[in-house]
Amino acid sequence: MGDLCESLVPDYGYQLAVASGFMNWLPDDFAHPVRVPVPGSALHLRPIKEADTALDYPAVMGSRERLWEIFGPAWAWPPETMTIEEDRLDLRRHEEEIAAHQSFNYALLDEKETEILGCVYIDPPERAGADGEVSWWVVDRLVGGEAERALDVLVPQWIAADWPFRQPRYLGRDITWQDWLALPPASSS
């Protein structure tokens, strides 16, 4: 799958990882994929950016109740009162973290990038027993459909093929969020 993905080399430091003790969660020479086609569809993944706010906000807020059920207990996201400006600042933070290789948020987009249809998050481990934590969602109208099924197949294959993890954890997939929250914190050593 690596040949399907273009890559981008990071260009600045890893401040969050230093603060959390995960300075070396990725190899120094790791180049993250910048475009990942979703097989059998016209959809693709790419790193989200601040300029995507006008696409992201309706996707998130249009699926907010379900997303809160999934991510709310762990991340307190997305808040009911989130404004477009708060979303813009959140996407700016994601864009900066991606560039620094602190964490990754990939938008699921249609072919012409006119709509965000979901996201994939790839993060350093917060809980013991993994070297990367991965979660994803699709907008409400795609739940249970072909696009969600394709993403469910793609993400673990893509992580195995293109990411340097030996023990990735798929939150909400191979472990419930409740069980994940009960795990001890990851060691910072």
Feature-to-residue mapping (PLM):
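GNAT-family acyltransferases
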Residues: 2-142, 153-189
